[in-house]
Amino acid sequence: IKFFLLILLSFNISVKANSNDEIQSLLKEGKKLIFIRHAIAPGGGDPLDFDILKCETQRNLSIEGIEQSKNIGKFFSENNIKIDKVLSSEWCRCKQTAQHAFDKYETKSFLNSFFSAKFASNKNKQIYDLKKYINEWNGDNNLVLVTHYVTIQEVLNITPSSGEIIISDKNFNVLARQNF
């Protein structure tokens, strides 16, 4: 039984390494969309006193979330993954993820959350604007989109974890996923 477990563990390690190599290879080809759900921010949804201009009224990254963001950035820099742009939701937890992972980013309202009833009416316009932006994007490298669960769920039909990256092509075909 111990021998079998050792073989099983060895297999799992090599599968993980192969998938990491596969992800690096995909990203080095360029022209990929990299959706990132914001890193760990305790709680769920948005507080009632939410103000987009005041981070103290929002969920923010925990210490673990900051480390998770830095690990995402480290993965990109250590593997020399080229990026055209990093776009982020205007929510502080997304901006914090982008800041700790990549340093430079631009905010785009089409990446904002529409989870709470307060923002649900924005959903169709945001998804339309997001798809239009991606359709018009012609970069040679990769496009990073730091956003929320609901946006990724709507566009890719994927249930992402906090700090997970989902790689797709411009037609929103999911090619790979990686947790950090």
Where are these regions (language model features)?
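Soluble or luminal CAZymes and related metallo-dependent hydrolases
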Residues: 64-68, 122-129
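Active-site-adjacent alpha-helix immediately C-terminal to a catalytic or transition-state-stabilizing loop
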Residues: 131-179
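Short hydrophobic "helix-edge" motifs at membrane interfaces and signal-peptide entry regions
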Residues: 3, 28-29, 138-139
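Short, intrinsically disordered, charge-balanced linker/junction segments flanking boundaries
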Residues: 11-17
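Sec-dependent N-terminal signal peptides
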Residues: 2-11
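All-alpha RGS (Regulator of G-protein Signaling) helical domain and cognate RGS-like helical scaffolds
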Residues: 12, 110-120, 127, 131-134
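Short, contiguous, well-ordered secondary-structure segments
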Residues: 35-37, 41, 126-135
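Active-site-proximal alpha-helix that buttresses catalytic centers in soluble enzyme cores
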Residues: 18-109, 114-118, 158-180
